Amino acid sequence: MSIAAKDIEPADIPGNLQGGEYSPYHVFSAEEWSRFRADTPLTLTADEVQRLRSLNDPVDLDEVRRIYLSLSRLLSAHVEASQILFRQRTRFLSMSNETKTPFVIGVAGSVAVGKSTTARILAELLARWPSSPKVDLVTTDGFLYPNAVLQRESLMDRKGFPESYDIGALLRFLSAIKAGRPNVKAPTYSHLTYDVIPDQFQLVDRPDILVFEGINVLQSRDLPADGKIVPMVSDFFDFSIYIDAEESLIHSWYVNRFMRLRETAFQNPQSFFHRYATISEDAARAIAEGLWHNINLKNLHQNILPTRPRADLILQKGPSHLTQTVALRKL
């Protein structure tokens, strides 16, 4: 079977993925991509997919068949190649006691685009490979500064922007993971209280694969003029995925999700956003629009979207919230 990017007419390729003969990506339609599944078995049920998907995300078993099984097969090849390279490098360096480090997959994309669903489904599929690898999933939410710190520094309206994260703690965590250390602590976050949970951690104990999900995980930093090594989060990734969609679609999904949450999670008196559950629908929608335009859209333009070309794989979603196009970086 031979499927190439040129099989798609240029008019069918989203403008943000077009790069002519100099494009670093192979681009496939979802239907063509699905054929790369080969004999990869479907190990999830419809009920499990429903449990894994986020609110307002219609991803179903058909989407898993079309997109995620081929992606699982691709990642299996990358993990196997990484293991071979690790053994060869260990022999080259005569390091007989070298500890195998986890294969780290970064998942990035805008708020409301569906990256959490992608990360959860991937983690489940990878854990069900015949080799039964140990797979952990960690999100960057826990590495946000606590609300008390953000309020003190006047950063609550910048929550989700790079400066709202404890980058030092984030880098120390990934460094420890890549060093193969046991029981590395990842701080946890409550979407109910909209805050980091004090003294509560997720223990990550030398997994074979770590799925690391967050909006800004592919972001780079300015390089110092003196050539000093400045680590970036993506330096610790073995493979990276960017979940993409047209801006107008993400906007619509964000507002619709906010309105759905108003009817569900926001009803809880403990919710940080409980006050929005009691106002009129028009007032709530106006607040959602304001949050989108004043915070999330700015973050998308300034910090998230510019990282898209750094991804190894881009999943481009369409109006139905399902993947329409897949772009895979050329080797």
UniProtKB/Swiss-Prot annotation:
Single GO cellular component annotation? Answer: cytoplasm
Instruction: Please give the chief subcellular localization of this protein.
Output: cytoplasm
Q: Does the keyword Lipid metabolism apply?
A: no
Task: List the keywords (alphabetical).
Answer: ATP-binding, Coenzyme A biosynthesis, Cytoplasm, Kinase, Nucleotide-binding, Transferase
Q: Where is the protein localized?
A: Cytoplasm
CDD domains given in the database record: PanK
Annotated EC = 2.7.1.33
Pathway-wise, it operates in: Cofactor biosynthesis; coenzyme A biosynthesis; CoA from (R)-pantothenate: step 1/5
The name this protein goes by in its record:
Pantothenate kinase
